[in-house]
Amino acid sequence: MESWLTSFITQSLVYSLLVVGIVSFLESLALVGLLLPGIILMTTLGTFIGDGKLSFYPAWISGTTGCLLGDWISYYIGLYFKNWLYNFNFLKKNQKLLDKTKSFLDKHSMLTIILGRFIGPTRPLIPMVSGMLKLPLKKFVFPSIIGCILWPPVYFFPGIVTGIAIKIPESSQSYYFKWLLLLISILIWLGIWLISKWWKMRKNHIDNRTSFFTKKKIGWLAILTMSSGILSLIAIQFHPTMLIFREIFSTILLGT
């Protein structure tokens, strides 16, 4: 998949943006998005941005457009094919996930639509379920736009960092810098995952006291992991190679 993306993206800017739009669209499309490795595809596209093969702002616009199309088509699929979807085998097997999504939409529709955009399994489900619940369009459209604007750069970011790291000239200093950058990325992403895990356990009143990883331990582990990631991120700012990293990063953001 990655080699196909590479060859297609290097053909022309139009093809590149078409790939970003299609990936974002399929990632957001009802049920289809569940079958795609979203973070891998978007991170790969982010790598092309960091490496200079793809422009950041056109990719962002293309990603947002594809995301909105996927969201709104999914909403109408849920609205007009509700009865068929309830009898669909895949949804029957994942009834628990469907029920949780419904519950969150009933209680906090706006927050659920925005935050659900960043969670793999719920991303292609929430717009469809919003339609199935006949959520008023005015309650769906605004958070959908916000989520679709924020989602592409967040999912591109790990790839952008990787692409910049590849672009940094080889030296003994840059070698250690790249490994530090990878470690920091892992710590921060792991910290975010642990926080979301702890939050789910807290919301659902789950505490596996028989398991080694209790809610309390996961909470402390989340704090330690996230703190280590943030402190390491602060410390790496003083590394000599960070000047080169900032220069490349600002070039990407400024589009120069």
From Swiss-Prot:
Subcellular location: Cell membrane
Transmembrane annotation, as ranges: 6-26, 29-49, 61-81, 145-165, 175-195, 218-238
Any matching Pfam family: VTT_dom
UniProt keyword terms in alphabetical order: Cell membrane, Membrane, Transmembrane, Transmembrane helix
GO cellular component, one term: plasma membrane
Mode of membrane association: Multi-pass membrane protein
Family that this chain belongs to: Belongs to the DedA family.
Protein name: Uncharacterized membrane protein BU139
Organism encoding this protein: Buchnera aphidicola subsp. Acyrthosiphon pisum (strain APS) (Acyrthosiphon pisum symbiotic bacterium)
Organism phylogeny: Bacteria, Pseudomonadati, Pseudomonadota, Gammaproteobacteria, Enterobacterales
